[in-house]
């Protein structure tokens, strides 16, 4: 298994939808979660870069699909946050369409990291994301973020509860706790990404370049 240097991760581009993304080759691992689940903080902690992914004080600001390259043909994708109530309905629909299209049609997508606040896990949209990934044979890592907000006993109890709950999806779903503040769970995240990037089959360029 190759140990990738996530500190070398760099921003490639932002795209409003799948049509504006670069060619569908290599391996992509996407990060998804509700607007306040700590997605940007997790990406910054993973890569040890303070501002790789912009953390917004206003949840729901990340409206674009953001691509980052870890190594040649190995990319991390920051998907638009979902489930934020104060976003105009039309904008919400636009994001959901872009999100759904990416998840459904992007061949190079081979792993999905679903982030959820440990204090509010497995909301409806989180479950839909996991269900969709399992149906598409995509491996899932659930990160229960902001784990530092709970005492050790409560943290373990919630971790076990969520691990038990995801068995119902009958898929490749792993659950871990994570804290950007305390750097907790970062090694587990890196290990999982290393495994995915090493073992998954990269999508090759087709001859006509499509």
Curated annotation (Swiss-Prot):
**Required co-factors:** Mg(2+)
Name the protein family.
Belongs to the TRAFAC class TrmE-Era-EngA-EngB-Septin-like GTPase superfamily. EngB GTPase family.
One of the record's GO cellular component terms: cytosol
User: Which keywords describe this protein according to UniProt?
Assistant: Cell cycle, Cell division, GTP-binding, Magnesium, Metal-binding, Nucleotide-binding, Septation
Domain EngB-type G residue range list: 25-199
Which PANTHER family is this protein grouped with?
A: ENGB-TYPE G DOMAIN-CONTAINING PROTEIN (PTHR11649:SF13), MSS1/TRME-RELATED GTP-BINDING PROTEIN (PTHR11649)
Biological classification of the source: Bacteria, Pseudomonadati, Pseudomonadota, Gammaproteobacteria, Enterobacterales
GO terms for biological process, alphabetical: division septum assembly
Q: Which organism is it from?
A: Shigella flexneri
What this protein is called in its record is Probable GTP-binding protein EngB
Q: Where does GTP bind?
A: 33-40, 60-64, 78-81, 145-148, 178-180
Molecular functions (GO terms)? GTP binding; metal ion binding
UniProt xrefs under Pfam families: MMR_HSR1
Q: Which residues bind Mg(2+)?
A: 40, 62
């Amino acid at each position: 298994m190759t140990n990738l240097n996530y500190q070398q991760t760099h921003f490639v581009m932002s795209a409003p939808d799948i049509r504006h993304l670069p060619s569908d080759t290599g391996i992509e691992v996407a990060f998804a979660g509700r607007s306040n689940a700590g997605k940007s903080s997790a990406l910054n902690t993973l890569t040890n870069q303070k501002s790789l992914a912009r953390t917004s004080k206003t949840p729901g600001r990340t409206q674009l699909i953001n691509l980052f390259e870890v190594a040649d043909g190995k990319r991390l994708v920051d998907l638009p946050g979902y489930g934020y109530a104060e976003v105009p309905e039309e904008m919400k629909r636009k994001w959901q369409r872009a999100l759904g299209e990416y998840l459904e049609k992007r061949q190079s997508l081979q792993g999905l990291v679903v982030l959820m606040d440990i204090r509010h896990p497995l909301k409806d949209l989180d479950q839909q994301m996991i269900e969709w990934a399992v149906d598409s044979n995509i491996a899932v890592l659930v990160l229960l973020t902001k784990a530092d907000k709970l005492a050790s006993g409560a943290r373990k109890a919630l971790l076990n509860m969520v691990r038990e709950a995801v068995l119902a999806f009958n898929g490749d779903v792993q659950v871990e706790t994570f804290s950007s503040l305390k750097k907790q769970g970062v090694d587990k995240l890196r290990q999982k990404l290393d495994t995915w990037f090493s073992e998954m089959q990269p999508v090759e360029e087709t001859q006509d370049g499509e």
